[in-house]
Curated annotation (Swiss-Prot):
GO terms for biological process: endoplasmic reticulum to Golgi vesicle-mediated transport; establishment of Golgi localization; intra-Golgi vesicle-mediated transport; intracellular protein transport; organelle transport along microtubule; protein secretion. It is found in: Cytoplasm; Golgi apparatus membrane; Cytoplasmic vesicle, COPI-coated vesicle membrane. The keyword Acyltransferase does not apply. Residues 1-21 are annotated as: Disordered. This is Coatomer subunit gamma-1. The gene is COPG1. SUPFAM superfamilies: ARM repeat, Clathrin adaptor appendage domain, Subdomain of clathrin and coatomer appendage domain. It comes from Homo sapiens (Human).
Length: 874
């Protein structure tokens, strides 16, 4: 027998594993003992244990050596030792996919399966099913049916679970065992009933009606097994989600009835299912919340944890539904289990009132040092949500966050705090200077490069706009002196932004940048030299274009375009307009941040959605002369209902002088194949349809794509808004649903689709301008135009802002899409690029009286984009 080690030895790992230095060849040599007579059960069981250990440690056994060991092991069936026999069953299962001719043990296993020794029968069933393939299954079908309804629970469960595994390869055979499985489902044994219902569900899961009947039967007659109840609750909730059924459904009634079950496991499963159902109202959640409230006072820690974690999830969407539990949650704040206490606190932060925040913060402070970073992040996220809910409490919450920031913690924890502080600074102008000062202190002793560079970027963006910007320069320049190259480069960029926006500080900034020109690192030197030359010109347009706003292109797209340019040498200079525009700010384009300690491997730049479309369209001969793709619509437009015989979705692709409409078509009729599918389009305005690219064949349920190429208006270039009537034309060929063979002859048919709208937003790509005022000055007023409009149907500033942003398809800058409370005036700042690469900026001043009055001022370097904006708004 193996030496018995106590738990302490096991945890210390000090030589407690007797199999640690096993060699495969030595173990296989030992396996020859299996051929000896008489059989030594104890020794053979020990060798089988070694073989199993090697396999489970990932040791590779060759087919020949595995087969030899397997055949030797079959001789051990001559022994009646129960331990050795069980080890044989385990070895058969593990070696069934390594050794050859494993079916040699079929007769021995069948004998054990039908024998009188109950301890052998269950494991024999499992081992037999492991080595049986679909061709042999019918030979043991009779034995399997008998085993399923066996009076011994272990045998019945083994047969049911094995049947479940066999479903994957022999569904039609196992389906014939349904009657036996139904008989087993009425067993008094909880595991047999659970496994039987599991098998029945997997046989019927593609038949929605049959599954509903199963649940109805369970509702009427009940079950003895709590495990079976839990499974049926999950099945019912899945059915509800798929059907998008109403809460009056019998399925929902069944789940709700399980809240009154005598087993805590079932009650929690039902409550969890109701909470996770999409679109549940507070009223429908009430019974589940009541049950979870009772669990909060349970003496069992596992139940308390489950309850408070689930209530935490409810509080995210329905905080009012959890308010009734606040007293119970407050009692859990002092729970000895810190995980429970943390979840209770974060739930209270989501449901508590403004007056309770100070008290909650004190309670959190008392145990923050005792919980893991993972739970600290949860607390920070809850505080972040609270800041948005109660902006007047930002001072209390900020102080708490700064205290946490000074404490020890990992990268994810510190990043969560920094994210939260930055969001408070952006949302609440009163907290800006306090927040920036504390972040300056943090980077003095910050070990994480990602956080230091992010804070430096924020200081460069927000610092120059404060009342005393010079106080931040010392902190930024300290980074140039004390940090490594990545942080130094970030600090140089931040310094340049101060110089670009503050003429008084410019001489001092130039002195500091001249010192940076002598840096050891290329990146730092290059940045310093570049910024120095730009700032010395003392031109606002240059500052805006090269320092404050920078490039608005996709970083991965730029990298790919430059790589392509170097691979194909050309006398023409690199054209920046050939690079796709960024659909997100530069900071958001970067890959997931990692701590500086992590070793970064070179990564292949992933293609963006627009680049994928660019490649697909370039492969179509008719589109090769269109130039670079300017924009693709963010979401496809559905031109049919999802339940109709043909499902058509359209993606709009905009080029400089053309538009391509991509129609993704799916044929949902299994007795038809469509050929030469096109979508004919009739414009209402001056657009001109140039050609159609058909989808050659559209078999059943296989998506296909056809295209329509349209020229943009030339006579009246401002008439960009247009409605197209669409009709799908195709040739129908009948086909056999079973074989898929189509008829040779077909007939022409057509199908009317929904109208398709083209709006001004399809011609503008949104871009982020970090400093709108600088960008506004950079564009200049040569083509500035201004008009005033009355929005008679709009009654609030928030609605007006939302509609304008959506209609124009431009990016709101400097958080101007957020309308302050109790204001009747607001200025919305929008930035974009018109097709062809022309910057377009819009400043919209809004006044709310009885209705909303809007004064729109547009600027661009070309006249056409300005005219289009004003024409579309009018």
């Amino acid at each position: 027998m193996l030496k018995k080690f106590d738990k302490k030895d096991e945890e210390s790992g000090g030589g407690s594993n007797p199999f640690q230095h096993l060699e495969k060849s030595a173990v296989l040599q030992e396996a020859r003992v299996f051929n000896e007579t008489p059989i030594n059960p104890r020794k053979c069981a020990h060798i089988l244990t070694k073989i199993l250990y090697l396999i489970n440690q990932g040791e590779h056994l060759g087919t020949t050596e595995a087969t030899e060991a397997f055949f030797a092991m079959t001789k051990l069936f001559q022994s009646n030792d129960p331990t050795l026999r069980r080890m044989c069953y385990l070895t058969i299962k593990e070696m069934s996919c390594i050794a050859e001719d494993v079916i040699i043990v079929t007769s021995s296993l069948t004998k054990d399966m039908t024998g009188k020794e109950d301890n052998y029968r269950g494991p024999a069933v499992r081992a037999l099913c492991q080595i049986t393939d679909s061709t042999m299954l019918q030979a043991i079908e009779r034995y399997m049916k008998q085993a399923i309804v066996d009076k011994v629970p272990s045998v019945s469960s083994s047969a049911l679970v094995s049947s479940l595994h066999l479903l994957k390869c022999s569904f039609d055979v196992v389906k014939r065992w349904v009657n036996e499985a139904q008989e087993a489902a009425s067993s008094d044994n909880i595991m047999v009933q659970y496994h039987a219902l599991g098998l029945l569900y997997h046989v019927r899961k593609n038949d929605r009606l049959a599954v509903n009947k199963m649940i109805s039967k369970v509702t009427r007659h009940g079950l003895k097994s709590p495990f079976a109840y839990c499974m049926m609750i999950r099945v019912a909730s899945k059915q509800l989600e798929e059907e998008d059924g109403s809460r009056d459904s019998p399925l929902f009634d069944f789940i709700e009835s399980c809240l009154r079950n005598k087993h805590e496991m079932v009650v929690y499963e039902a409550a969890s299912a109701i909470v996770n159902l999409p679109g549940c109202s507070a009223k429908e959640l009430a019974p589940a919340v009541s049950v979870l409230q009772l669990f909060c006072s349970s003496p069992k820690a596992a139940l308390r944890y489950a309850a408070v974690r689930t209530l935490n999830k409810v509080a995210m969407k329905h905080p009012s539904a959890v308010t009734a539990c606040n007293l119970d949650l407050e009692n859990l704040v002092t729970d000895s289990n810190r995980s429970i206490a943390t979840l209770a606190i974060t739930t209270l932060l989501k449901t508590g009132s403004e007056s309770s925040i100070d008290r909650l913060m004190k309670q959190i402070s008392s145990f923050m040092s005792e919980i893991s970073d993972e739970f600290k992040v949860v607390v920070v996220q809850a505080i972040s949500a609270l800041c948005q809910k109660y902006p007047r409490k930002h001072a209390v919450l900020m102080n708490f966050l700064f205290t946490m920031l000074r404490e020890e913690g990992g990268f994810e924890y510190k990043r969560a705090i920094v994210d939260c502080i930055i969001s408070i600074i952006e949302e609440n102008s009163e907290s800006k200077e306090t927040g920036l000062s504390h972040l300056c202190e943090f980077i003095e002793d910050c070990e994480f490069t990602v956080l230091a560079t992010r804070i430096l970027h924020l200081l460069g963006q927000e610092g120059p706009k404060t009342t005393n910007p010079s106080k931040y320069i010392r902190f930024i320049y300290n980074r140039v002196v004390l940090e490594h190259e990545e942080v130094r480069a970030g600090a140089v960029s931040a310094l340049a932004k101060f110089g670009a926006q503050n003429e008084e500080m410019l001489p001092s900034i130039l002195v500091l940048l001249k010192r940076c020109v002598m840096d050891d690192d290329n990146e730092v030197r290059d940045r310093a030299t570049f910024y120095l030359n730009v700032l010395e010109q003392k031109q606002k347009a240059l500052n805006a274009g090269y320092i404050l706003n920078g490039l608005t292109v996709s970083i991965p797209g730029l990298e790919r375009a430059l790589q392509q340019y170097t691979l194909e040498p050309s006398e023409k200079p690199f054209d920046l307009k050939s690079v796709p525009l960024a659909t997100a700010p530069m900071a958001e384009q970067r890959t997931e941040s990692t701590p500086i300690t992590a070793v970064k491997q070179p990564e292949k730049v992933a293609a963006t959605r627009q680049e994928i479309f660019q490649e697909q369209l370039a492969a179509v001969p008719e589109f090769r002369g269109l130039g670079p793709l300017f924009k693709s619509s963010p979401e496809p437009v559905a031109l049919t209902e999802s339940e109709t015989e043909y499902v058509i979705r359209c993606t709009k692709h905009t080029f400089t002088n053309h538009m391509v409409f991509q129609f993704d078509c799916t044929n949902t009729l299994n007795d038809q194949t469509l050929e030469n599918v096109t979508v004919q389009m009739e414009p209402t305005e001056a657009y001109e349809v140039l050609c159609y690219v058909p989808a050659r064949s559209l078999p059943y349920n296989q998506p296909g794509t056809c295209y329509t190429l349209v020229a943009l208006p030339k006579e009246d270039p401002t008439a960009v808004a247009c409605t197209f009537s669409c009709m799908m034309k195709f040739t129908v060929k009948d086909c056999d649903p079973t074989t898929g063979e189509t008829d040779d002859e077909g007939y022409e048919d057509e199908y009317v689709l929904e109208d398709l709208e083209v709006t001004v937003a399809d011609h503008i790509q949104k871009v982020m301008k970090l400093n709108f005022e600088a960008a506004w000055d950079e564009v200049g007023d040569e083509f500035e135009k201004e008009e005033t409009f009355t929005l008679s149907t709009i009654k609030t500033l928030e609605e007006a802002v939302g509609n304008i942003v959506k209609f124009l398809g431009m990016h709101p800058c400097e958080r101007s899409d957020k309308v302050p409370d109790n204001k009747n005036t607001h200025t919305l700042l929008l930035a974009g690029v018109f097709r062809g690469g022309h910057d377009i900026l819009v400043r919209s001043r809004l006044l709310l009286l009885d209705t909303v009055t809007m004064q729109v001022t547009a600027r661009s370097l070309e006249e056409l984009p300005v005219d289009i904006i004003l024409a579309s708004v009018g």
